[in-house]
């Protein structure tokens, strides 16, 4: 199943902010910026991708990416689809072409993992309108 992107809000990855205990993934639409908070490992994985620093051994995200490459699967898009008590939820859409057949699979995933894979695959990030409305805006001074 594919989500109708005409009702979705396009989101751009802005940056990550890391502390000693958590990572904030800053996302932005045309109207506002908001943060998705996650663990340090997710932040390190995004940072490694952005700086193109390869770790000695593959990270979990790199491992997943190797599986995708082997199965000829690509990340089509991600959708941040729900917000409950400051916890975001996401769906990742995977695409596999086999000859004339096209398979699209929708999977529940953590936003941090979804965003990391979207950045790796240069896939678009979207947000459901109600999630965007309820996301707490970050002030530019806090960034």
For each of these PLM feature ranges, what is it?
Residues 1-143:
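Divalent-cation
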């Amino acid at each position: 199943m594919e989500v109708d992107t005409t009702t979705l809000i396009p989101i751009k990855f802005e940056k990550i902010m890391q502390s000693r205990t958590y990572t904030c993934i800053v996302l932005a639409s045309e109207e506002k910026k908001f943060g998705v908070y996650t663990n340090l490992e997710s932040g390190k994985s995004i940072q490694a991708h952005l700086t193109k620093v390869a770790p000695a051994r593959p990270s979990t995200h790199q491992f997943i990416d190797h599986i995708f490459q082997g199965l000829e699967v690509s990340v089509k898009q991600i959708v941040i689809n729900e917000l409950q008590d400051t916890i975001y939820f996401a769906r990742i859409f995977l695409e596999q072409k086999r000859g004339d057949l096209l398979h699209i699979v929708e999977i529940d995933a953590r936003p941090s993992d979804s965003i990391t894979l979207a950045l790796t695959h240069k896939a678009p990030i979207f947000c459901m309108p109600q999630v965007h409305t309820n996301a707490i805006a970050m002030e530019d001074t806090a960034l």
